[in-house]
Regions:
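Short, solvent-exposed recognition segments
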Residues: 2-11, 137-212, 277
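N-terminal helix-turn-helix
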Residues: 2-94, 98, 259-267
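Short, structured helix-loop boundary elements
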Residues: 21-25, 81, 94, 98, ...
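Amphipathic alpha-helical effector-binding/dimerization core
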Residues: 79-175
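Juxtadomain coupling helices with adjacent low-complexity linkers
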Residues: 201, 228-277
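Short hydrophobic beta-strand micro-motif common in sensory/regulatory domains
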Residues: 215-219
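Sensor-regulatory modules in signal-transduction proteins
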Residues: 221-224
């Protein structure tokens, strides 16, 4: 998600929502999603502006979430509480993410060092569902649950390359790229060519697209029908690795790990659903 972006609480136009759609629930979830590394705490008016609600509606949702233990308040500023972590951990364990994904990610890190992640496409963003790394400081931290613009990551570009032409056209027509670094590609025509090249090559490389100091190589994880359901990457520090070095040294291992994961998820129906398109 690009900095300053307003949270879309439904992801659908009003006339596309099911009759049973619960607006109040969507508002509450939207408020939880509005807190991130850039907005760790906010006033009532800031929350309302981020989610696109009236202050009165935002206040009702915040009070409900506060009563349930998901949101805390310090003076006039609201923040998330640790109970929010239970929502993500329930998915992690019930879907088999730790059992299926983490072993291969740990093996890649043990073999090459640096970091390895798995992500899925959610709207215009890639969400990191598994991660392993050597413990070093990074500015853009790829922790489980982190959400970043798909156009600026190796994972995201692989996932975009896995879309059919109509879905890719729809994405490119809607996305409004933001320069996260001086090297971030924000021209939509250039992005299209990059994504089509990823589709042809079978892998994606990025250098300083999301943040300075991150060079990454990503490949697709495919389901039983051959469609891209997720992406896997290996990343290092710009200046210590190059895209060419990643391709030469890590691509075979990355492709093998992606194949193992793709075969393994067939044994976990929930994981298939989580990682499906």
């Amino acid at each position: 998600m690009a900095p300053g972006q307003v949270i879309d609480i439904s992801g659908q136009a009003a006339d596309e929502r099911p009759a049973e759609f619960v607006e109040a629930l969507a508002k509450g979830i939207g408020i939880l999603e509005s807190f991130d590394a850039t907005h760790p705490e906010m006033t009532l008016s800031e929350v309302a502006r981020r989610v696109g609600l009236s202050p009165a509606a935002a206040r009702r949702s915040l009070i409900t979430l506060q009563t349930l233990g998901y949101v805390g308040q310090t003076e006039r500023r609201f923040h998330l509480r640790p109970k929010v972590l239970t929502l993500g951990s329930a998915l992690f364990f019930s879907a088999g993410i730790g059992e299926v994904l983490q072993p291969d990610l740990r093996e890649l890190v043990e073999q090459f060092g640096d970091a390895s992640s798995t992500g899925t496409l959610e709207g215009e963003d890639v969400i990191y569902v598994a991660h392993s790394s050597v413990q070093r400081a990074r500015r853009a931290t790829a922790t489980i649950g982190a959400r970043y613009p798909a156009y600026a990551t190796s994972l995201g570009r692989v996932l975009l390359a896995g879309l059919d032409d109509a879905a890719l056209d729809a994405y490119l027509a809607k996305v409004r790229p933001v320069a996260l670094t001086s090297k971030t590609v924000i021209d939509v025509a250039d992005l299209r060519q990059i994504i089509l090249a990823v589709r042809a090559d079978g892998y994606s490389t990025t250098v300083d697209q999301l943040d300075y100091g991150i060079t990454a190589l990503g490949v697709a994880i495919r389901g039983p029908d051959g469609r891209t359901v997720a992406a896997l990457n290996s990343s290092g520090y710009t200046g210590m690795v190059t895209p060419e070095k990643l391709i030469e040294e890590r691509l075979p291992a990355l492709l093998a790990a992606a194949s193992r994961i793709g075969n393994a998820i067939t044994r976990y129906p929930i994981l298939q659903s989580v990682m499906g398109p």
